[in-house]
Swiss-Prot record:
This is Inner membrane-spanning protein YciB. The chain crosses the membrane at residues 10-30, 50-70, 72-92, 118-138, 148-168. The keyword Transmembrane helix applies. It comes from the Bacteria. It comes from Shewanella sediminis (strain HAW-EB3). One of its GO terms (cellular component) is plasma membrane. Belongs to the YciB family. It is found in: Cell inner membrane. Keywords: Cell inner membrane, Cell membrane, Membrane, Transmembrane, Transmembrane helix. It is a multi-pass membrane protein. It holds the Pfam family IspA. InterPro entries: YciB. Plays a role in cell envelope biogenesis, maintenance of cell envelope integrity and membrane homeostasis. The gene is yciB. Signal peptide: none annotated.
Amino acid sequence: MKQLLDFLPLVIFFAVYKLFDIYAASGALIAATALQLIVTYLLYKKIEKMHLITFVMVTVFGTLTLVFHDDAFIKWKVTVVYALFAIALAVSQLINKPILKSMLGKELVVEDRIWAHVTWYWVSFFITCALVNIYVAFSLPQEVWVNFKVFGLTALTLVNTVITVIYLYKNMPEEHKKELNNK
């Protein structure tokens, strides 16, 4: 259910874009992201920081898009969010409090150096996505950018998640692999 909620704003953004335009889609994205926060809180009694940051960014950039009737703002939102994720991961690693380890370290037990590899891998991924988004958003037609945002970035994130899980599993001590397989 939680994963479905994560995709709700993206699906609504895409559907409204296809039916109307980028401005209606931006407004729908703001509303859908707010709805996502409300439903998540009602179901789980907490809101993750990532969802809150995303909501703030969607609201700010979506509102700017609507007020100035300029799609550049909603396009920049993707780059800014990815850049913030990269910065947060990099800083957490540099101060020896890796976010990914704190989120996943109880389930996936690996050495700190492996968590560092994974963190820097994701920092690189987010920076790459931020830069590619700039290119696609401002060099190609709007419809191409919308498809890239919805399908391309989602697929890339999924592939990188699978690669990360495989890498973590491969570097996990055998006793933890057995324990994980028995769950």
